């Protein structure tokens, strides 16, 4: 295979391949489309399509697909071959510019949330030239957006690209005011840290709950979990190391910058982190990464679990969304600068983020809301459901000094005025790493830690980009008309700090006292998905997202509907799986063991009625009680699921699930898990937590 540099990005139609396979004129025209959004001429599209097809066929591809990200949360693709009939009865390999730019998949079976009727099947895919095409297996995959016949976004890429453009538009206004004439565009970059579990495939196949839902619905706590803290950063087991090596190779071939890998806190839990890339590309790459992780695992006799909470009692999995803003000239706008103006510029962008997170904390919470993530958030392993920002003591001290017009200690008692004084330099390390914060500043970026491990990162970045764009718009509107730029700038930053300091919290987010303090500050707290999703339609949210043309009101309403539907369907599948497992596996197992014990007692009594059999009799009594409880709790859960059919709408159904079904699922699990602890191992019908968590050797 050669060195990594020999095969890195070998399956990607990237800039190097374009230069080598396109004429200079076609290449320059395509670059203009990629860099500036210029319209692509039909002749150029045909030339690009022909070169792309020749390159792909040369790598063994026989088909192409418009690869898109519908609102299911996973990717979608329909494969068409390159073959066309030739006059002599043979075939030619053909691919036109029209086929490259636009596709027409059937949209009827994808979630639309009422944006179209089922009979209105036509949907369109449109090529995203900013994200390179790639080869997967024998198929050329062309990243695309996906919309309805009427033009409404039916995917996650379209609003993400819109949000990036909205932020670029407003950030450019600010940068012009600071005299940055050489900057042509501003982009957000993301590096998502992907957590996951690896378990033996042969054990996975014996667990209906893992197969149907991606998480264990039953399972008693094993003698050992993560108490010893010996797995985090521990020596990677040979089988896992082999998996990681193959995974890296597959990712590198696709140009995915896989960088860091290590064991995570829970047994069998691991993490993969890439180098940062532009947000839409990072989103595409993360979707690919999750798919490839699961495929490579199968080759190693493993299963990769991406659910946020596959096992109770140990940490779940998240996906830290490391987000930054930079210019095309290479300036990170979240890094303090060397000159007074650079520091004022940094503080303005910092304040824009602070204001955005405070004003739209509900949208950030909504962006990570799923049934799976509800198990993780606020569970002393992940940030709470309350959104707050961590800045660190030194940056906090600087903001306090600006707010109060008081000297900052580290600045030698010198009162700072923005645009006049240089912000004191501080090492990135002084910002610490508060793992309990949902949204932490870590030196030159923000780390949004609420995203779930199976989630697309698109949603979180759509809301974050749009909210920051709104803050920057407000700032630009005020500064562009200011008579005294420096005075207005200082006043505006000072006002932002005063008005939005409630969102800043540098303490322990796991502490219950913080939830009480957050309530006093007036911060929103939405513990579950049904609590937060309806707030997407709050007036301020509709106004902001529509004003920046990120989502229309109809698109927002559809997403509200789809998110609630997904929540309901997910939990109902879990509940029905529990009912099935309880009746067909757990109850027969407990009854079988009880019968064996009863037979043993009868055999002993047949020898002598004086034999006490106290242990067996006590255990039989306990198992009999548990059997009745499991049966009763199963019936109660089934009844609560059946009651959902009477719900007036999806919101009412979601509330009923939150208020009744979830609790009855927990009650059934509690008695079933207790039964596991007193049932002989040979009778228990599926692998235990101990086997699953410590099965990869």
Language-model regions: role of each:
Residues 73-89, 108, 207, 214-216, ...:
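Short linear, low-complexity motifs centered on an aromatic residue
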Residues 61, 65-69, 285-299, 325, ...:
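Hydrophobic/aromatic-rich, well-ordered segments within soluble, folded domains that form packed cores
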Residues 1-14, 33-35, 223-232:
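Gly-rich Lys/Arg/Thr-decorated short loops/hinges at beta-loop-alpha junctions or inter-strand turns
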Residues 7-120:
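Active-site core of metal-dependent hydrolases
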Residues 69, 87, 252, 298, ...:
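Hydrophobic alpha-helix feature that most strongly marks membrane-spanning transmembrane helices
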Residues 120-306, 315-318, 325-563:
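Glycine-rich, acidic/polar active-site loops that bind/position phosphate-bearing ligands
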């Amino acid at each position: 295979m050669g060195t990594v540099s020999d095969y890195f990005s070998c399956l990607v139609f990237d800039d190097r391949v374009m230069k080598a396979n396109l004429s200079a004129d076609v290449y320059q025209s395509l670059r203009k489309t990629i860099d500036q959004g210029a319209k692509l001429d039909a002749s150029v599209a045909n030339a690009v399509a022909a070169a792309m097809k020749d390159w792909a066929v040369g790598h063994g591809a026989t088909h192409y697909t418009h690869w898109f990200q519908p609102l299911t949360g996973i990717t979608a693709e329909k494969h068409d071959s390159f073959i066309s009939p030739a006059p002599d009865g043979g075939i030619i390999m053909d691919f036109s510019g029209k086929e490259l730019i636009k596709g027409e998949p059937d949209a009827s079976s994808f979630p639309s949330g009422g944006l179209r009727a089922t009979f209105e099947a036509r949907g369109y895919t449109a090529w995203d030239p900013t994200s390179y095409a790639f080869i997967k297996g024998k198929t050329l995959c062309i990243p695309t957006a996906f919309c309805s016949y009427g033009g409404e976004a039916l995917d996650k890429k379209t609003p993400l690209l819109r949000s990036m453009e909205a932020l670029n538009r407003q950030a450019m206004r600010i940068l012009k005011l600071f005299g940055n004439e050489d900057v042509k565009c501003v982009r957000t970059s993301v590096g998502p840290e992907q957590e996951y579990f690896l378990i033996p495939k042969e054990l996975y196949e014996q667990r209906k709950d893992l197969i149907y839902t991606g998480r264990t619905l039953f399972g008693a706590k094993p003698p050992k979990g993560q108490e010893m803290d010996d797995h985090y950063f521990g020596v990677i087991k040979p089988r896992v190391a082999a998996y990681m090596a193959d995974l890296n190779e597959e990712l590198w071939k696709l140009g995915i910058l896989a960088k860091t890998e290590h064991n995570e806190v829970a047994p069998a839990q691991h993490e993969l982190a890439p180098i940062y890339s532009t947000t839409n590309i990072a989103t595409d790459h993360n979707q690919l990464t999750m798919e490839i992780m699961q495929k490579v695992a199968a080759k190693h006799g493993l299963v990769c679990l991406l659910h946020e909470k596959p096992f109770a009692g140990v940490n779940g999995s998240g996906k830290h969304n490391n987000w930054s803003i930079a210019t095309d000239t290479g300036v990170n706008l979240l890094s303090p600068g060397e000159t007074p103006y650079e520091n004022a510029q940094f503080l303005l962008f910092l304040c824009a983020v602070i204001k955005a997170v405070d004003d739209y904390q509900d949208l950030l919470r909504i962006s990570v809301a799923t049934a799976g993530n509800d198990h993780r958030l606020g569970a002393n392993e992940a940030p709470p459901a309350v959104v707050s920002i961590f800045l660190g003591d030194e940056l906090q001290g600087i903001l306090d000094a600006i707010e109060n017009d008081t000297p900052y200690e580290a600045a030698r008692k010198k009162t700072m005025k923005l645009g006049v004084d240089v912000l004191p330099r501080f090492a990135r390390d002084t910002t610490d790493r508060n793992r309990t914060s949902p949204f932490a500043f870590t030196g030159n970026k923000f780390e949004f830690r609420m995203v779930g491990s199976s989630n697309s990162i698109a949603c979180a970045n759509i809301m974050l980009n749009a909210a920051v764009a709104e803050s920057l718009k407000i700032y630009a509107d005020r500064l562009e008309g200011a008579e005294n730029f420096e005075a207005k700038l200082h006043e505006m930053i000072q006002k932002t700090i005063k008005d939005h300091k409630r969102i800043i919290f540098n303490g322990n987010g796991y502490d219950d006292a913080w939830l009480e303090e957050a309530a006093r500050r007036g911060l929103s707290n939405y513990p579950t998905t049904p609590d937060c999703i309806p707030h997407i339609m709050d007036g301020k949210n509709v106004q902001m997202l529509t004003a920046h043309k990120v989502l229309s009101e109809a698109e927002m309403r559809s997403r509200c509907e789809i998110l609630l539907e997904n929540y309901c369907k997910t939990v109902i599948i879990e509940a029905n799986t529990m009912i099935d497992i309880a009746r067909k596996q757990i109850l027969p197992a407990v009854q079988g063991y009880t019968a064996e014990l009863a037979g043993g007692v009868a055999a002993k009594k047949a020898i002598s009625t004086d034999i006490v059999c106290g242990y067996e009799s006590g255990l039989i009594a306990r198992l009999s009680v548990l059997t009745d409880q499991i049966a009763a709790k199963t019936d109660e859960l089934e009844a609560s699921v059946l009651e959902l059919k009477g719900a007036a709408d999806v919101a009412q159904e979601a509330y009923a699930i939150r208020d009744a079904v979830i609790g009855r699922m927990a009650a059934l699990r509690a008695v079933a898990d207790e039964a596991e602890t007193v049932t002989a191992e040979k009778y228990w019908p599926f692998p235990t937590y101990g086997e699953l968590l410590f099965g990869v050797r």
